[in-house]
Each structure stands twice: as structure tokens, then as C-alpha cells.
UniProtKB/Swiss-Prot annotation:
<feature type="modified residue" description="Phosphothreonine">
    <location>
        <position position="338"/>
    </location>
</feature>
<feature type="binding site">
    <location>
        <position position="336"/>
    </location>
    <ligand>
        <name>thiamine diphosphate</name>
    </ligand>
</feature>
<feature type="binding site">
    <location>
        <position position="238"/>
    </location>
    <ligand>
        <name>Mg(2+)</name>
    </ligand>
</feature>
<keyword id="KW-0630">Potassium</keyword>
<dbReference type="GO" id="GO:0009083">
    <property type="term" value="P:branched-chain amino acid catabolic process"/>
</dbReference>
<feature type="transit peptide" description="Mitochondrion">
    <location>
        <begin position="1"/>
        <end position="45"/>
    </location>
</feature>
<feature type="binding site">
    <location>
        <position position="239"/>
    </location>
    <ligand>
        <name>thiamine diphosphate</name>
    </ligand>
</feature>
<feature type="binding site">
    <location>
        <position position="159"/>
    </location>
    <ligand>
        <name>thiamine diphosphate</name>
    </ligand>
</feature>
<comment type="subunit">
    <text>Heterotetramer of 2 alpha/BCKDHA and 2 beta chains/BCKDHB that forms the branched-chain alpha-keto acid decarboxylase (E1) component of the BCKD complex. The branched-chain alpha-ketoacid dehydrogenase is a large complex composed of three major building blocks E1, E2 and E3. It is organized around E2, a 24-meric cubic core composed of DBT, to which are associated 6 to 12 copies of E1, and approximately 6 copies of the dehydrogenase E3, a DLD dimer. Interacts with PPM1K.</text>
</comment>
<feature type="modified residue" description="N6-acetyllysine; alternate">
    <location>
        <position position="356"/>
    </location>
</feature>
<keyword id="KW-0597">Phosphoprotein</keyword>
<feature type="modified residue" description="Phosphoserine; by BCKDK">
    <location>
        <position position="337"/>
    </location>
</feature>
<feature type="binding site">
    <location>
        <position position="212"/>
    </location>
    <ligand>
        <name>K(+)</name>
    </ligand>
</feature>
<keyword id="KW-0786">Thiamine pyrophosphate</keyword>
<dbReference type="InterPro" id="IPR050771">
    <property type="entry name" value="Alpha-ketoacid_DH_E1_comp"/>
</dbReference>
<dbReference type="Pfam" id="PF00676">
    <property type="entry name" value="E1_dh"/>
</dbReference>
<protein>
    <recommendedName>
        <fullName>2-oxoisovalerate dehydrogenase subunit alpha, mitochondrial</fullName>
        <ecNumber>1.2.4.4</ecNumber>
    </recommendedName>
</protein>
Amino acid sequence: MAVAIAAARVWRPNRGLSQAALLLLWRPGARGLARSHPHRQQQQFSSLDDKPQFPGASAEFIDKLEFIQPNVISGIPIYRVMDRQGQIINPSEDPHLPKEKVLKLYKSMTLLNTMDRILYESQRQGRISFYMTNYGEEGTHVGSAAALDNTDLVFGQYREAGVLMYRDYPLELFMAQCYGNISDLGKGRQMPVHYGCKERHFVTISSPLATQIPQAVGAAYAAKRANANRVVICYFGEGAASEGDAHAGFNFAATLECPIIFFCRNNGYAISTPTSEQYRGDGIAARGPGYGIMSIRVDGNDVFAVYNATKEARRRAVAENQPFLIEAMTYRIGHHSTSDDSSAYRSVDEVNYWDKQDHPISRLRHYLLSQGWWDEEQEKAWRKQSRKKVMKAFEQAERKPKPNPNLLFSDVYQEMPAQLRKQQESLARHLQTYGEHYPLEHFDK
């Protein structure tokens, strides 16, 4: 409109134009055209005064053909608080957490590590059908969980068991879910590691990759409209960030100004695909500004860096109603799952480096030792105690029966429709006739 007005001010009416044509050219505010006179001196016009008015972007005109080159600047820096020996680098960034809270961080990570080892071996022995470990990524879980309010809603992917662990989710329920027994909150309907807990505001995990991202945005939008003073945090891996749902979620969150934290665990591999084959840009954090999202990249093996970033993101997300993106750089030490053999696509030396030289548990242990809050005797006692606790829950879960097969048909409708009741009756007749072919003794009566 401004360009049209400027042009109108220097335009001389052609005597051949009718009065009607002149009226069609005039618009409110274009006074120069309405008052123009053939003998009035033209105003000087400079292209420097021509400012972009396009509604889609805020920018300046340039007169040189130049494409934007990828990675022309150095990569987004990685924020950290502790070095690999657990020493605080910049005292002003020390969160100064009390001893009790730091010990809870450490015990949550080590308890998760112990549970992982036992359940991984139980799958290898055929006791459960599937499992996914969290080796190497424990710091991203508990560091972020500690910075949230307990009522903040969590949407996980499938490798965030530490968030529930920090929220005091009982070991018995972890085991019940993996075994699919009668104590499982999901009534045995989900495959292992698909946890969920309404009381702890942890939305049940679903297998399809990245579906939780737009769902989390919807929940955050609802929280905003309800003035709930809560944030939604959505976890995902860098592989899931390549899914279309990630784009939809990022864009909706930015345009609807939702109080959400997108937490990306960049662990180096999307199953067997390394990051070098996943994207050419500067990781995931670099995508945030393009959507209008505040973004940061942190050392995911530094639990304090994760804590600080999440705490500040939460504060601002609630206060300002805007999304934040945290990319936590870490490494998946374990196999993708019990269905994967990572030795086929990475070296043992590579894995050993991260396990021995830059493990989040080791880093926090160094910090505790330097503070005088932990010693080797306490370490041995806790490791023994944690294993005993996990084994007790493990043995209890193994002894409990599976849910009654009739529960397959419940919790779908408030009142069971005729078609579903017909299927239930059909299953009952089938089991009555051929029950000896099924391990019904393992199911609740």
C-alpha cells in the first residue's frame, strides 16, 4: 500500500482517463492522487525510502543476489555448569542446590541404572518381551524433572523413565508395566516401557514416533486458556524431530503462544542412523528461531546445566506464554532396544569413551565427593541397597498373574455396545473350548 501511495504522489493524470477511472484508482489515505495537479512539481522519490511491507517477514531489501549459506557461522554453543570432573566452571551459574536435592538427583539416576540392568537381563532371559535402557541419558531425565513443578504435565517418548523415577513412581509399578501383570495401571495392554501415571501427571507413552509433540502443544494451549499456571514438557529424540509432527507442533506452539518446553535428547543416533545422516543443519536447537521459539543447547551429561535451562524455560514459559526449545547433547550408551545390536553400526571404543569418560552419573558423583556429601562406603552401601530394592519389586511382579482376558473389552465405552459384547462372548466360548492350548493359569480368574 505504501508503495502504491508513493507512486500515486508522483503520477500525473492522463487527460484521457475518465472521472470514474480516477475514482477507482483512489483509495482512502492516497491524498496525493486525489489532489494531484498537472502543473504541481513532482516530489523526489528514492529507492532507499522503499521499505518492505510484506506481511510474512520482517526484513530489509537488498540489491545484491545472495543465497543464505548453511552453517556460515559457528555452531550454537553448548551451555554447561560442571566440567567432566564435577567442578563448577562459573560460580555464578552454580544452582546451589541443597544437599538433599543433589542426593535425590544422584540416587534417582543410579536407581534407574540398576533397574535398567536387571530388566535388560530379564528380557534376555525371556522373562519379559521387550526393553529399552536409559544408559548415558539419565542426566537429561532427572535434571529436567527436578526443575519442574510436580503438577506440570509430561509427554514422553520412550526413554524418559528417569522423570517418573524422580517423581517417586514406585519400582513395583515400573515392574508391573513391563510384566503386564494385574498391578499394571495400563492393565497389560501396552508393550513394556510404555509407562503412564495420571497421579504424577505423566501421559501414557505411545509407540508411534513424534505423535506426542502436537498432542503436548494442544495440552499446553488448553492450560493457557484455563490460566492453569502450569507448563507442559514434551520429550523427544533428534530422530523424532525429523518427523512431520515435529514441524506441526513447533509451528502451532509458536503461533498460539503456548507454555511448553520442547526437550530434545540428541543422543547421536536415531536407532542406527547417526546424526550425520539425519540432518545437514546445526542440530535441533538451530531450528527453533526459524519458528520463533526461544532455544538453547545444553550439555545433557551435566545435570546442573539441564536443571538451570529447564528451570528458566519453565519460569518464562508460564510468565510469558511462549514455547522454549532445549536441545540436550548426550550419548546413548546402550543399544536402541533389546531388538537392536548397536555393534553393527558403531565401535566398542566409541561406546566405551562415553561410558568411561563422560557419563552423567560419574560427573555428579565427582561433584558429591568434592563437596564431602558422599564417599566410597556410602556408594557401596547404596548400590547394594538399590539392587535389593529392584530385585524385590522384580520378584513380586513375576509372581503376580496377568489381567483377566475380559479386561480386553473394558475401558473403551462407558456402556459396552452390542457388537463389543458379542466379541467378548465369542472369546469366552473360544477359551472354554480350546482353553488347554493357552497358559490361562497365568491369568487372573
